[in-house]
Curated annotation (Swiss-Prot):
GN (gene name): dapAL
GO CC terms: cytoplasm
Subunit composition and interactions: Homotetramer.
Top-tier EC class: lyase
Keyword Signal: no
GO BP annotation list: small molecule metabolic process
Natural source organism: Thermoplasma acidophilum (strain ATCC 25905 / DSM 1728 / JCM 9062 / NBRC 15155 / AMRC-C165)
Name by which UniProt lists this protein: Uncharacterized DapA-like lyase Ta1157
Predominant place of localization: cytoplasm
Family annotation (SUPFAM superfamilies): Aldolase
Catalytic residues (positions): S44, Y106, Y132, K161
Length: 292
């Protein structure tokens, strides 16, 4: 059973746009201090479409090697089934327990196409797999019927990350949660609400930057619902809204670099936030307690 807070990791970069592995170590150290339960490299926040297969493999391996025993949820998404299969086999070869797979993107698949993609990739390796529903970026919804079909046919399909932001859809799929299938919320501002109706946890971008998300989860798990609610309203939401003033996911990169004194970079076509956007983010960053 999977639960808790999983961080959809940024992929720290130098000013030349290449992956900065020293900054990645700093990120993982921070995440360990925050108390996250999982590391999700090469997801949407990690800008996986911008990296070659070799770059993805190297980064996944690095995170695995430096994970500090935190569970790694490896992103294997691609518009190519062949690449997703290759990445899946690689994650199994290096001992990563969990993969995360979204639909193919750019060319919009129908349900049969989507089933073929998922079933082929799921079958390519024996390690566990999480379905990733993010229609606003992939262009395709993963239907409730397809979720049911995949979980029925493949025993290694262990959960879903739903980043649709549609609580009606989330409320429908939550009924599929059981001891063998977990459901995670992918939108930070919906975490408290989702936990309240039975979510297993959250895959939350703000956990790259601050302990707000893990604090919320721990207070909720301890039964301190009013404390958890106040963290959602007073801490999580203002920071999320400030960061999302910038084009996704540039605000998360800027905030991480700023909080850690790193002169980081942005791989084209991503650009850094504007001066006004930075000011709004900076105002919220000053509220985050400093590490002791």
């Amino acid at each position: 059973m999977y639960k808790g807070i999983v961080t959809p990791m940024i992929t720290p970069m130098g000013q030349n746009g290449e992956i900065d592995y020293r900054a990645t170590e700093i990120l993982i150290d921070n995440l360990a201090d925050f108390g996250v339960d999982g590391l999700f490299p090469m997801g949407s926040t990690g800008l996986f479409p911008m990296f070659s297969t070799d770059e993805k493999k190297k980064f996944l391996g690095f995170v695995r090697d430096h994970s500090k025993k935190i569970e790694v949820y490896a992103g294997v998404g691609s518009s190519s089934t062949q690449e997703s299969v290759e990445l899946s086999k690689y994650t199994e070869d290096i001992g990563i327990k969990v993969r995360v797979l979204m639909p193919t993107y750019y060319i919009k698949p129908d349900e049969d196409w989507m089933y073929r993609h998922f079933s082929t990739v799921i079958s390519a390796a024996s390690n566990d797999l999480f379905i990733y529903n993010i229609p606003q970026l992939s262009g395709s919804w993963i239907s409730e019927s397809l979720i049911e079909k995949l979980t029925r046919e493949f025993s290694n399909v262990k959960g879903i990350k739903d980043s649709s932001g549609d609580m009606r859809f989330f409320s429908r799929i939550i009924r599929h949660k059981n001891e063998k299938f977990d459901i995670f919320q992918g939108q930070d501002d919906l975490l408290f609400l989702s936990l309240s109706i039975g979510a297993s946890g959250g895959v939350c971008g703000l956990s790259n930057i601050s302990p707000y998300i893990t604090n919320l989860y721990h207070e909720f798990s301890a039964g301190n619902l009013e404390k958890a609610r106040k963290i959602q309203i007073d801490e999580v939401n203002p920071l999320m809204y400030a960061i999302n003033e910038a084009t996704f996911p540039a605000g998360y990169y800027y905030a991480f670099y700023k909080m850690n004194g790193i002169k980081g970079g942005y791989r084209a076509p991503m650009v850094e936030p504007t001066t006004d956007q930075k000011k709004k983010i900076d105002q919220e960053l000053t509220k985050i307690p400093k590490k002791q």
